[in-house]
UniProtKB/Swiss-Prot annotation:
Keyword DNA-binding found: yes
Stated family: Belongs to the MCM family.
Residues with PTM Phosphotyrosine: 708
Residues where Phosphoserine is found: 160, 275, 535, 611, 668, 672, 681, 728, 734
Designated name of the protein: DNA replication licensing factor MCM3
Length: 808
């Protein structure tokens, strides 16, 4: 037995010597010697080693490292500590252990959670997946020091479990007494702890077999690897696959829980901070100077080139990506700089496609849908921790998208309670939680881009925008811009769209020949942490314009060039940093245009507002003008920026409402027939038309086509063909009749009872007259009813319109 231990020690020392020779490569290329020096200067203790380099120098040792990870990694880490001590002895004493992280090509050991089987136990594997869950970071004791006051001795105890590289786990009993039953005091300052976190990685949905649920695996992160990732990140985790026995009632069952003990974590998703070279900065400066006149239009045209038209919407989305300037005033108030946009329109007008483009372009973007997300899922939820049973906060989509964009599709399918939850986020940029003993405030400074369908499925142009949208004013005022996107029947437009869509379907990626079979399934999987065909030169050389493709971009026009997506991403990232200042001229213009917007809806008869014009609209104009100035890389918000912002708001805030002319003609013919039957004179008819010009619309038309009447007025409609002269006579009589206060009070009580019985906010005039006089000893005449209603209308208690009484 002793010989075996000695043999193991000999093998361990031999492995340690091999790894030390590999690290000490001064005579070769000196790669790892320079890496260790960088590690010391950066005050780090984990060295990332490429398996390909080890395989090139010592293939046998590389194979043993991948297949017998625990013993080999212990030897490798000891060799690293010896090598660090040879370079800087004082630095080596600062840390008890130095760690090795692996990267490179793993071949058959590059797996997904589904293909991670028992044959990979104790091997180094590379697993790809999406992070679905992250536990809290907790301290884990590595070494505890205890002092005995009675004997004045110090006791030290080390702890190791199955998640560490040590072969045999130690006892987890924390000592409180020594061998002679003397009490011990823990010296917390001398004890050593390490950070510990557990994350769950799930198989990528595109790589899961059809019709099967994606599988997941738990990953243990220690020390410097904690908090490297967050839920939703696509990652590659390199680590050792190990099984942990599960004890139940003192017995170990035959099935084991498996975990991955990570030694390196690498993000696969695009970086929040794109890498810039000096060449990129020079290109961005040159582009902003040479195209200073039409740079905003040029960038807006290049947004989502696969979508035809929607020029104003693309300009607004560019403003959303650039954002305004956020301000925190001295009195504690906060002025948001994020721009929120709502797209409402018919099906198949590319609303969801625009959202998908923003997801690909914005540095941080979180997608959600109206039906699949709740209020707490968007803001923050209080959950119970599985390990400790404590209550803790879990961030929602808007908190995760802090300083980014939240894209909400099918916004109209959300319930009113869930929509109310995002009110605070959209204006204040934060989430306040006060429940289950937790009071917290989380930052959620994100822009909201939402898409919704109208109330009736398709947009009804004969109804006002507010009736079509069907959302509360308190929510609509928080959206800076609301666009109504219609699917209109225009032969010329339809021809252009069909030509564009057909070109998109005929487009083939570069390198594919026409007529070649399209590959089934996904592209070829790269079984390495880095793409072997990737060269750093490709990353640095970012082209400003895309190469023209007749299928992708259509027939080439003289001055129309498309900015490439990579350059657009970098340009937006640089432009967002600029904080332009309003000039006196632009501030005066915005103030003047704001007052004009407030009064515009009362002047124009055939247009209606899509959302209320409030004081928030003034801030919207400032934010849009600031975003336009950022696109020009300007330090000031000039008059041209303010004019562009006003043009966007004018387009988004007002929508034309059509009138049903054919039906109006038909109704007027019916009216004339009714008047002939009653044998009205020509003079009375002229007086009637004069009065009709004064009132907004005809009474009969209102009775038959009123959207607000929820009572059974349809049964009464045929009876409302009496000539309108009686109404005019009643109004004349009502002017003569003076109603006493007691009669008015009795009428108000009877009217309230009528509304209560009807369970509605509106009642027809005929039904009102019958109900008021039903059980009344002193019935009201029609003149008294008209006089009482006019008095109540003056006091803003009711509203009478087109023969229907509305309760305010």
């Amino acid at each position: 037995m002793a010989g075996t231990v000695v043999l193991d020690d000999v093998e361990l020392r031999e492995a340690q010597r091999d790894y030390l020779d590999f690290l000490d490569d001064e005579e070769d290329q000196g790669i790892y010697q320079s890496k260790v020096r960088e590690l010391i200067s950066d005050n780090q203790y984990r060295l990332i080693v490429n398996v390909n380099d080890l395989r090139r120098k010592n293939e046998k040792r590389a194979n043993r490292l991948l297949s017998n990870a625990f013993e080999e990694l212990v030897a490798f880490q000891r060799a690293l500590k010896d090598f660090v001590a040879s370079i800087d002895a004082t630095y080596a004493k600062q840390y008890e252990e130095f760690y090795i992280g692996l990267e490179g090509s793993f071949g058959s050991k590059h797996v997904s959670p589904r293909t991670l089987t028992s044959c990979f136990l104790s091997c180094v594997v590379c697993v790809e997946g999406i992070v679905t869950k992250c536990s809290l970071v907790r301290p884990k004791v590595v070494r505890s020091v205890h002092y005995c006051p009675a004997t004045k001795k110090t006791i030290e105890r080390r702890y190791s479990d199955l998640t560490s590289l040590v072969a045999f786990p130690s006892s987890s009993v924390y000592p409180t007494k020594d061998e002679e039953n003397n009490p011990l005091e823990t010296e917390y300052g001398l004890s050593v702890y390490k950070d510990h976190q557990i994350i769950t990685i799930q198989e990528m949905p595109e790589k899961a077999p059809a019709g099967q649920l994606p599988r997941s695996v738990d990953v243990i992160l220690d020390d410097d690897l904690v908090d490297r990732v967050k839920p939703g990140d696509r990652v590659q985790v390199v680590g050792t696959y190990r099984c942990l026995p599960g004890k139940k009632g003192g017995y170990t069952s035959g099935t084991f829980r498996t975990v991955l003990i990570a030694c390196n974590v690498k993000q696969m998703s695009k970086d929040v901070q794109p890498s810039f070279s000096a060449e990129d900065i020079a290109k961005i400066k040159k582009f902003s100077k040479t195209r200073s006149k039409d740079i905003f239009d040029q960038l807006a045209r290049s947004l989502a080139p696969s979508i035809h038209g929607h020029d104003y919407v693309k300009k607004a989305i560019l403003c959303l990506l650039l954002g305004g300037v956020e301000r925190d005033l001295e009195n504690g108030s906060h002025i948001r700089g994020d721009i929120n946009i709502l797209l409402i329109g018919d099906p198949s007008v590319a609303k969801s496609q625009l959202l998908r483009y923003v997801l690909c372009t914005a540095p941080r973007a979180i997608p959600t849908t109206g039906r699949g997300s709740s209020g707490v899922g968007l803001t923050a939820a209080v959950t119970t921790d599985q390990e400790t049973g404590e209550r803790r906060l879990e961030a929602g989509a808007m908190v995760l998208a802090d300083r980014g964009v939240v894209c909400i599709d099918e916004f109209d399918k959300m319930s009113d309670m869930d929509r109310t939850a995002i009110h605070e986020v959209m204006e204040q940029g934060r989430v306040t939680i006060a429940k289950a003993g937790i009071h917290a405030r989380l930052n959620a400074r994100c822009s909201v881009l939402a898409a919704a369908n109208p109330v009736y499925g398709r947009y009804d142009q004969y109804k006002t925008p507010m009736e079509n949208i069907g959302l509360q004013d308190s929510l609509l005022s928080r959206f800076d811009l609301l666009f109504i996107m219609l699917d209109q029947m225009d032969p010329e437009q339809d021809r252009e769209i069909s030509d564009h869509v057909l070109r998109m379907h005929r487009y083939r990626a570069p390198g594919e020949q026409d007529g070649d079979a399209m590959p089934l399934g996904s592209a070829v999987d790269i079984l390495a942490t880095d793409d072997p065909n990737f060269s750093p030169d490709d990353q640095q050389d970012t082209q400003i314009y895309e190469k023209h493709d007749n299928l992708l971009h259509g027939i080439k026009k003289k001055k129309e060039k498309m900015v490439s997506a990579a350059f657009m991403r970098k340009y937006i990232h640089v432009a967002k940093i600029i904080k332009p200042v309003l000039t006196q001229e632009s501030a005066a213009y915005i103030a003047e245009e704001y007052s004009r917007l407030r009064s515009q809806d009362s002047m124009s008869s055939d247009t209606a507002r899509t959302s209320p014009v409030t004081a928030r609209t003034l801030e919207t104009l400032i934010r849009l003008a600031t975003a336009h100035a950022k696109a020009r890389m300007s330090k000031t918000v000039d008059l041209q920026d303010a004019e562009e912002a006003v043009e966007l708001v004018q387009y988004a805030y007002f929508k034309k409402v059509l009138e049903k002319e054919k039906k109006r003609k038909k109704r007027s013919e019916d009216e004339s027939d009714a008047e002939d039957e009653v044998e009205k004179s020509q003079e009375d008819q002229e007086q009637k038309t004069k009065r009709r010009r004064i009132c907004p619309s005809d009474a009969k038309e209102g009775d038959s086509y009123d959207p607000y009447d929820f009572t059974n007025t349809e049964e009464e409609m045929p009876q409302v063909h009496t000539p309108k002269a009686t109404d005019s006579q009643e109004t004349k009589e009502s002017q003569k009749v003076e109603l006493s206060e007691s009669r008015l009070k009795a009428f108000k009580a009877a009217l309230l009872e009528v509304f209560r019985e009807a369970h509605a906010q509106s009642v027809g005039m005929n039904r009102l007259t019958e109900s008021v006089n039903r059980d009344n000893e002193e019935p009201f005449s029609s003149a008294e009813i008209q006089a009482a209603l006019s008095r109540m209308q003056d006091d803003n208690q009711v509203m009478v319109s087109e023969g229907i009484v509305f309760l305010i």
